[in-house]
């Protein structure tokens, strides 16, 4: 489902995408590749359509800025329209030169990976671009109303980007009052008329905000954002959709779906849900189809979905809800914003959610079901829809807000491993690994998409620094995941110990890498928030033999709001060593202030020190 009714700039695809996952410090303004000016006016019409006229101007300051403007694309629905009213290039000291019509191309836009779209795409290619010239273009756009939408909703997002913002002015008009909600818009002047039907937004002074060299798992969860809507009421915005969903749900189940419901009849509710999720996974593929019309949030009918054999999120969600209801399980279609990053709900309008799921009540508990996923863990919410708001379309036609909680930490990874060293630093390894939750989901998806042989090769690489003779024992992975899944491995690690001079060392640098990354965040002055994935518990029970170490017993017990760590390590009777390490990750996000706090700094120091205790000098037996 689309998030934005339209983009404020042709640069959205290239610039916005570069700025979403932030990559450390703020880039100096002297390094800005482009200088930009934006001015646009939009009218929200009585029929819920929108008309906009916008002018964008960019001056190329650096060679990289030229590449950003190399080709400018704009895709739009077949039912919408776009006219390039003016496009011109101005060389330094010269006069504006209109862009030749041969450099403006309009064609059918390419389809997405998993769907059909009826979209057009207009592209502009300015000639003779180099450092210094200024390009400018003016667009006139008309956006038709989405099916069943009775309220307008507009999102103006101003994230950091590699463009020096010299001027920004936006004006909005409507035939009914405009409700305004915003966050982090202090750099902008927001003026609204007395009748609330006109709004002007302008940048107070030029600015440049762009992040560089942030971590790979860094994001900006809060950026300057303004949202406009004709109503702040959930029912006003989504009531018509709830009514249509209920009309579809009231229809008789098609033959295949009815047979699937009959097949699980009489089983415990948990097994019925798993059986119906399995049926959808086996029978339907995820594919969005907008060829006939722009459907917006409106699903196909149940009969159409079965006839097609595919559907997008709203199609599969309403089919699952219908089947669950037929099985006697309370189920309601639900709209959410899917992904690692979810915005706060400022205006509950139609562009706030981007995904459809099902809220079900199973054995007295709430399950959040996403039938578009290639795996299903009964009773557990998928990581990309946890910890966020949800708009539930009730059977009574009422729309209500609910909250999807963050899952509590579970035993995600449990490793029992023995390493027996030979005289040359190799080790014979036997390992038993129990997976659940996210790692098990990843394993099942890898088997499905790449095949078991490829997955096994990856697993063997993870069992050793330099492995050979790797033999794995594991069951076939399934769509419906068990509570835990066991992998047994036997192999030789040819580089089990690090050698320095004439000594051999055992270490767990893999356990230290996370704390090294946090320390790097602090020392480099990184700014964004870090996404850690869902809360989890990892534990290791490790036995080392075949050599001797003089390392004494060690223990750690570290407690914090973010992580708990326990270590129990002691010499073994045979001269080897044995330790148990357990780490509990309690949160999915760490923000800038948390990471730079004194308490988190203490956590880094303690955790590094704890892992450092597992650096052992190993004296190997002599060559036989």
Regions found by a protein language model. Name each.
Residues 2-23:
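Gram-negative bacterial Sec-dependent N-terminal signal peptides
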Residues 24-624:
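A sensor for short, sequence-defined functional sites
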């Amino acid at each position: 489902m689309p998030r934005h009714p339209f983009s404020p700039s042709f640069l959205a695809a290239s610039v916005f995408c570069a700025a979403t996952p932030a990559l450390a410090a703020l880039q100096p303004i002297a390094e800005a590749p482009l200088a930009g000016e934006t001015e646009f006016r939009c009218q929200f019409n009585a029929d819920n359509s929108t008309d906009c006229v916008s002018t964008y101007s960019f001056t190329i300051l650096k060679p990289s800025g030229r590449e950003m403007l190399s080709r400018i694309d704009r895709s739009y629905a077949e039912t919408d329209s776009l006219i390039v009213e003016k496009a011109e290039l101005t060389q330094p000291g010269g006069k504006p030169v209109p862009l030749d019509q041969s450099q403006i191309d309009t064609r059918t836009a390419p389809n997405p990976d998993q769907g059909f779209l009826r979209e057009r795409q207009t592209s502009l290619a300015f000639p003779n671009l180099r450092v210094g010239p200024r390009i400018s273009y003016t667009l006139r756009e008309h956006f038709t109303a989405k099916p069943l939408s009775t309220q307008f909703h507009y999102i103006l997002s101003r994230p950091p980007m590699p463009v020096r913002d010299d001027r920004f002015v936006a004006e909005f008009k409507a035939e009914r009052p405009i409700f305004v909600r915003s966050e982090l818009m202090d750099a902008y002047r927001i003026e609204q008329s007395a009748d609330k039907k006109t709004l002007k937004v302008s940048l107070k002074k030029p600015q440049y905000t762009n992040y560089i060299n942030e971590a790979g798992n860094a994001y900006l969860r809060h950026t300057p954002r303004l949202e406009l809507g004709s109503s702040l009421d959930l029912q006003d915005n989504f009531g018509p959709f709830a009514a249509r969903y209920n009309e579809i749900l009231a229809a008789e189940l098609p033959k295949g779906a009815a047979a699937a419901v009959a097949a699980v009849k009489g089983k415990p509710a948990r097994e019925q849900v798993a059986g119906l999720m399995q049926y959808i996974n086996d029978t339907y593929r995820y594919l969005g189809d907008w060829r006939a019309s722009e459907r917006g949030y409106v699903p196909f009918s149940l009969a159409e979905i079965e006839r097609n054999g595919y559907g997008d999120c709203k199609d599969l969600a309403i089919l699952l809800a219908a089947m669950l209801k037929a099985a006697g399980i309370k189920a309601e279609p639900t709209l959410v914003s899917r992904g690692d990053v979810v915005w706060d709900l400022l205006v509950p309008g139609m562009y706030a959610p981007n995904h459809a799921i099902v809220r079900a009540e199973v054995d007295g508990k709430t399950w959040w079901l996403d039938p578009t996923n290639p795996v299903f863990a009964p009773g557990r919410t998928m990581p990309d829809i946890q910890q966020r708001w949800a708009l539930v379309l009730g059977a009574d036609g009422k729309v209500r807000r609910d909250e999807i909680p963050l899952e509590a930490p579970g035993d995600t990874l449990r490793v029992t491993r023995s390493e027996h060293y030979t005289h040359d630093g190799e080790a014979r390894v036997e390992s038993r690994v129990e997976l659940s939750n996210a790692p098990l989901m990843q394993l099942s998806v890898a088997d499905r998409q790449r095949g078991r042989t490829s997955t096994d090769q990856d697993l063997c690489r993870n069992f050793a620094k330099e492995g050979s003779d790797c033999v794995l024992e594991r069951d076939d992975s399934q769509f419906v995941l068990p509570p835990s899944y066991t992998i047994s491995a036997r192999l030789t690690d040819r580089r089990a110990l690090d050698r320095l001079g004439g000594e051999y060392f055992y270490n767990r640098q893999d356990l230290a890498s996370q704390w090294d990354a946090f320390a790097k965040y602090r020392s480099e002055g990184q700014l964004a928030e870090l996404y850690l994935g869902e809360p989890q518990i990892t534990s290791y029970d490790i036995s080392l033999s075949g050599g001797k170490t003089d390392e004494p017993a060690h223990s750690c017990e570290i407690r914090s709001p973010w992580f708990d760590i326990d270590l129990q390590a002691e010499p073994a009777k045979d001269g080897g060593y044995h330790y148990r390490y357990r780490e509990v990750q309690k949160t999915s996000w760490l923000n800038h202030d948390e990471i730079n706090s004194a308490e988190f700094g203490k956590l880094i120091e303690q955790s590094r020190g704890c892992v450092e205790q597992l650096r052992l000098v190993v004296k190997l037996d002599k060559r036989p």
